[in-house]
């Protein structure tokens, strides 16, 4: 191991020190500059493959801002990215790597749909009945997501199991169980592919401002409310203090009497509850039921980059999630309206994501290195 200290004068150390000390505006500027650089490189690649970079750029922005539908679909994607990003950020702030958000998302959405379909026959087919179904289904989805995340949390706290390994394994288990349920016990009647029946029309979020059936401002408002509540929890409560202290300086948390085991399980449970809520909103607002989980976008994995870009700050997750939502929508639109290969579009979008996320990832790693250096 190198004897270099955090205060050594090497080039890498100077860059790390600059990133760690960067203020909020500087970090935003770094992110914007990185994104613009990546986009420029991507456009050069597009031109080198014989396609028009001007067309690429025009269709990208047209897909995001060019119509009411484009804006609505961008906000729809952003809603899910924000919720999943907050779920990841909660765990990461506590120094816990919850890589299982996608599995918790799937189980939360599936549990929500199963609950609504099971209770629908016993409730009136009106607005009151619809909102009752939405609330009850969402509560069940949140609880299921939380319990599914509590399992690897308990394994880490009481059996010293690596949460990265256990959460990744639980992702595959969630996909497998979900596919089994949708191919058998809960497959919709008369439906060939693995999916549930559609939710009742009255058990849906109302259209507000936008007339796009798969998006409602109610879902976006839920995401913003979760962001604010999570921020207050982490910065203004004893529970949040215990979580953040455990993540930043484990030894300091231990000396101050923070119950490490309970904090780990509680943090994972909260993270999973938010992931379950994301799945519930996605199932109600976007799918109107539930489909083969293998075909669902990997929001839980992409949310890791969203959280890193936001420096694991719930407030920062909002612009980061909206960036990812816009890129997702713009990339899809380009694939539909041009002959540019989808692989090339995905590559350029991935390049932007990589360039934007890496500086923040490096900053977080450098900050931890400095903290460990101070402890020594």
Language-model-detected regions and their locations in the chain:
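Hydrophobic alpha-helical segments embedded in the membrane of multi-pass proteins
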Residues: 78-89, 104-107, 147, 169-172, ...
